C-alpha cells in the first residue's frame, strides 16, 4: 500500500494546485423561480462565456411498456431535429458562425439541453436553444433518422463494438429487472420499432412541463437576460404526470450471473448491488470516501487500480461507484444532471484477457470483502479525504459544470460538491467503516461478463473451483503469489437458477 498512498498524496497535491487555478469564487445565485419556472442563475460578470442548461426530470423511466426508448427519442427530436422556423440542417447552419452547439443527453430520470457560447453571440444562441425545446418541428425525416440512430446504437454499437457498455447494460438489466430502470435508456429494438411520431408528440405535450423543469444560466450574461430567458419557458404546461413510482430497493441475498456470449478478445466485467442510499442520505458521503479509496474513476488512487493493474497487470483499470456514473466527455469527471432516486454500488473492470478474467473478478471481490471486514486503513482514510476534498472541486471547474451541479442540488436537495467540502474535514474513519458494513458486501451481487465460450465461464464459476492468474513475466514477489493463492479460491456462491447465458444478438431485443 505504500505505492498507493504515495500516489494518493501526489494526486491530492495536483488537485490542490488545479483547484486553485480553475475554480472561481462561489457566485451569488439569482432567483429560485421566474414565472413558475425553477431557475439557477450563477453570474460571473468577468467571464466572456455564458452557459445555458435546460433540465427536465423526464427520462426512460417514463417510457410506456412496449415503447422503451420513447423519452430519449423525444429528446433527440428536440435537440437533433428542426424547429418550427428552421429545418435541422438550417439549425446547424445557424449554430456554425456562433462557434456553439446544442448538446442533448438523457438517462433514467433526466433530459438535458445545454451549450456554452461567447456572450457576443448569446442572444442568437439563446433563441436557437429555446426554439428547439419550445417549438419542435417533429418532421418525419428527423424522426426516421433519430429513431434509426437509436436502434443502431442498441443493435449495432452495444452488441457490436462496445463490450464495456454492453456489460454494464447487461448487469443493469438483471439488477433492475421489472423496474423502470431495467431497459437501456436508449430503448430496446422492439420498443423503438413500436414508437410512432405521434407517440413522440404526445410524450412531449404531457411530460415536458414546468414542474419537471429547471432552467440554468451561468457566466458573463447581461442584466435581465437570465430572467427573460427563463420566462420563455412559461409557455410549457404547468404540470406533468407524477414521477414514475419506483418499487422499494430490493434486499438481494443471492448472487446472480449473466454471461453474454460474444466473440470477444477480452472479457468485460461489471458487478452491481442495490443500495438504499442517495445524495440526500448521510451515509452517501462516507460511502463516497470508501468508493474513492476502493476505485476512483480513471485515477491511480484506488486499491483496485493498484492491486489489479499496477501489481498484476490484469487490465487497463478497475473502478468503483456508489451512484450512477457517466463520464463527461473526455474528462475523468462525472457527468452532471443524471441523478436518480435510487442508486446502486458498482464495480467496473476494464476488459481482461480470457485466461485471467475470472481471477480478476475474484480479485475485485476479495478487495471489496477486505474493505468490508477490516475497514479502511487509517492512512488510506486520511489520504483519500485529502484527495477527495480537492478532486471534487474539479468536478465543477467551469461555468457549465458548476451550473449542472447546482441544478442537481435543486433536484436532489443536496449540492454534492459543497456537501463533501463541508463533511470531509469532520468525517471519522468509524463513519466510513459503519457505512461500508451497512451497505456494501460481496453477497447479493449481480455479475455480468461479456465473453466467448460463455457457457464454459458460467460452468467454471458454478463449480466453485479455483481460477488462477497467468503472468507474462517471471519474478512475481512471494507476497503477491501467496495472496494470489487466496484470491483464486475466493468463493462466489452461485445457484444454477440464478445463472443465465445469453447470445449477444438477443440482448435488448424487447
Question: Could you tell me what each predicted segment is?
Answer:
Residues 8-17:
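Bacterial N-terminal signal peptides
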Residues 25-32, 172-213, 244-248, 277, ...:
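Histidine-acidic residue clusters that define the catalytic metal-binding segment
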Residues 27, 34-37, 46-53, 65-70, ...:
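Extracytoplasmic
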Residues 53-116, 182-186, 298-327:
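M16/MPP (pitrilysin/insulinase) zinc-metallopeptidase core fold and M16-derived inactive scaffolds
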Residues 86, 90-203, 248-250, 254, ...:
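Acidic/histidine-enriched segments that form metal/cofactor-coordinating
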Residues 149-170, 248, 252-266, 311-329, ...:
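Short acidic/His-enriched helical or mixed secondary-structure segments at domain edges of catalytic enzymes
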Residues 168-169, 197-232, 444-445:
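Non-catalytic, conformational "gating/processing" segments within enzyme and secreted inhibitor domains
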Residues 177, 214-277, 296, 451-455, ...:
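An aromatic/glycine/proline-enriched structural segment found at the starts
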Amino acid at each position: 500500500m505504500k505505492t498507493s498512498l504515495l500516489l494518493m498524496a501526489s494526486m491530492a497535491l495536483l488537485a490542490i494546485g488545479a483547484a486553485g487555478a480553475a475554480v472561481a469564487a462561489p457566485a451569488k445565485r439569482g432567483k429560485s423561480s421566474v414565472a413558475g419556472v425553477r431557475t439557477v442563475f450563477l453570474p460571473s460578470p468577468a467571464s466572456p462565456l455564458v452557459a445555458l442548461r435546460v433540465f427536465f426530470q423526464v427520462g426512460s423511466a417514463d417510457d410506456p411498456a412496449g415503447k422503451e426508448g420513447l423519452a430519449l427519442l423525444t429528446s433527440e427530436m428536440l435537440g437533433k431535429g428542426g424547429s418550427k422556423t428552421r429545418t435541422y440542417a438550417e439549425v446547424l447552419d445557424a449554430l456554425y458562425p456562433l462557434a456553439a452547439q446544442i448538446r442533448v443527453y438523457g438517462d433514467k430520470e433526466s433530459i438535458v439541453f445545454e451549450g456554452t457560447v461567447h456572450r457576443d453571440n448569446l442572444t442568437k444562441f439563446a433563441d436557437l436553444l429555446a426554439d428547439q425545446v419550445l417549438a419542435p418541428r417533429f418532421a418525419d425525416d428527423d424522426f426516421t433518422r433519430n429513431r434509426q440512430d437509436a436502434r443502431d446504437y442498441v443493435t449495432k454499437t452495444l452488441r457490436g463494438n462496445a463490450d464495456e457498455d454492453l456489460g454494464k447494460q447487461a448487469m443493469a438489466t438483471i439488477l433492475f429487472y421489472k423496474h423502470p430502470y431495467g431497459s437501456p435508456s436508449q430503448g430496446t429494438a422492439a420498443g423503438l420499432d413500436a414508437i410512432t411520431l405521434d407517440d413522440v408528440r404526445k410524450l412531449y405535450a404531457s411530460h415536458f412541463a414546468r414542474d419537471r423543469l429547471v432552467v440554468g444560466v451561468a457566466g458573463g450574461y447581461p442584466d435581465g437576460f437570465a430572467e427573460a430567458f427563463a420566462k420563455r419557458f412559461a409557455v410549457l404546461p404547468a404540470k406533468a404526470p407524477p414521477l414514475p413510482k419506483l418499487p422499494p430497493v430490493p434486499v438481494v441475498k443471492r448472487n446472480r450471473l449473466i454471461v453474454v456470449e460474444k466473440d470477444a478478445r477480452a472479457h468485460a466485467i461489471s458487478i452491481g448491488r442495490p443500495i438504499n442510499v442517495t445524495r440526500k442520505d448521510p451515509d452517501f458521503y462516507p460511502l463516497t470516501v470508501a468508493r474513492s479509496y476502493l476505485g476512483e474513476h480513471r485515477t491511480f488512487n484506488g486499491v483496485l487500480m493498484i492491486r489489479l493493474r499496477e501489481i498484476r497487470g490484469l487490465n487497463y483499470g478497475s473502478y468503483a461507484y456508489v451512484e450512477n456514473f457517466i463520464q463527461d466527455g473526455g474528462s475523468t469527471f462525472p457527468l452532471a444532471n443524471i441523478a436518480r432516486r435510487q442508486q446502486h454500488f458498482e464495480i467496473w473492470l476494464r476488459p481482461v484477457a480470457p485466461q485471467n478474467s475470472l481471477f480478476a473478478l475474484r480479485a475485485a471481490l476479495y478487495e471489496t470483502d477486505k474493505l468490508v471486514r477490516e475497514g479502511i486503513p487509517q492512512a488510506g482514510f486520511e489520504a483519500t479525504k485529502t484527495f477527495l476534498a480537492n478532486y471534487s472541486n474539479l468536478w465543477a471547474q467551469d461555468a457549465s459544470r458548476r451550473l449542472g451541479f447546482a441544478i442537481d442540488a435543486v433536484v436532489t436537495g443536496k449540492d454534492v460538491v459543497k456537501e463533501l467540502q463541508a463533511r470531509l474535514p469532520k468525517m471519522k474513519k468509524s463513519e466510513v467503516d459503519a457505512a461500508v458494513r451497512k451497505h456494501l458486501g460481496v453477497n447479493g451481487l449481480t455479475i455480468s461478463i461479456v465473453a466467448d465460450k460463455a457457457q464454459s465461464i458460467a460452468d467454471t464459476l458454478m463449480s466453485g473451483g479455483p481460477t488462477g492468474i497467468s503472468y507474462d513475466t517471471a519474478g512475481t514477489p512471494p507476497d503477491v503469489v501467496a495472496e494470489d493463492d487466496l484470491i483464486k479460491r475466493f468463493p462466489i456462491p452461485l445457484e444454477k437458477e440464478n445463472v443465465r447465458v445469453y447470445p449477444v444478438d438477443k440482448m435488448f431485443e424487447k
